[in-house]
């Protein structure tokens, strides 16, 4: 939604800055509606929550893998590459045929779906951010993306550290500091003090690990919250 920081930044402000054309679907994205819309629009960049790719994967790919000649061919090692190319083209065509990159965020990606998309060299990358960071924290081009990660944090624009004795192997809370970190919640000093410390570090509430090159991996939440597949935050 454009009312969200992510939607405002990447579906509105970024296209305005570069002269991009934006298409807002305006309807619930069922696989049928999505495929029909993509055939007309033929987008070059798609920013979406994981559920969009997962729906198309289940609709377009799984039936081929689970039955028919292709399911048999997949079991023959020498045919794998050819089969992957066929599936990749079918998926790309389902999204209009012109997509150069899929930027996914807002919720965890199903590991089975992510693993398969990377196996067929689908142009996918997963980013990470939050409203309080306006909103991007990490992003990596698809050709540099590491499986199960959410990209490298934006070095030069912000600092990120893991509150852990061993940030690479032991999960700790992800802390962020930089110019585009918020100054505080509007007229809510109590909540502001809970997430922003005296040194300017934003305590995200997300638990993660980080590679030496700055690649982030989300491992869970330090707060009680359910994050649904469509990006909705549910507080039980």
Enumerate the predicted regions with their spans.
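Short acidic loop-to-helix transition motifs that present clustered carboxylates
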Residues: 28-33, 109, 132-133, 234
């Amino acid at each position: 939604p454009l009312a969200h920081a992510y939607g405002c930044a990447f579906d509105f402000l970024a296209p305005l800055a570069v002269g991009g054309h934006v298409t807002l679907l305006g309807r619930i994205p069922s696989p049928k509606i999505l495929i029909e819309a993509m055939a007309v629009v033929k987008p070059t960049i798609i920013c979406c929550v994981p559920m969009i790719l997962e729906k198309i994967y289940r609709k377009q790919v799984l039936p081929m893998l689970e039955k028919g000649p292709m399911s048999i061919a997949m079991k023959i090692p020498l045919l794998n590459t050819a089969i992957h190319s066929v599936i990749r083209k079918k998926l790309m065509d389902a999204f209009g045929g012109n997509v150069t990159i899929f930027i996914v965020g807002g919720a965890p990606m199903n590991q089975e779906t992510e693993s398969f998309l990377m196996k067929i060299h689908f142009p996918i990358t997963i980013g990470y951010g939050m409203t309080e960071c306006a909103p991007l924290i990490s992003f990596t081009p698809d050709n540099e993306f590491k499986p199960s990660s959410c990209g490298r944090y934006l070095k030069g624009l912000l600092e990120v550290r893991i509150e852990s004795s061993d940030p690479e192997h032991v999960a700790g809370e992800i802390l962020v500091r930089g110019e585009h970190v918020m100054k505080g919640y509007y007229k809510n000093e109590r909540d502001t003090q809970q997430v922003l410390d005296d040194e300017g570090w934003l305590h995200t509430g997300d638990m993660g690990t980080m590679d030496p090159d700055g690649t982030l991996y989300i491992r869970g939440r330090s707060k009680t919250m359910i994050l649904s597949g469509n990006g909705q935050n549910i507080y039980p």
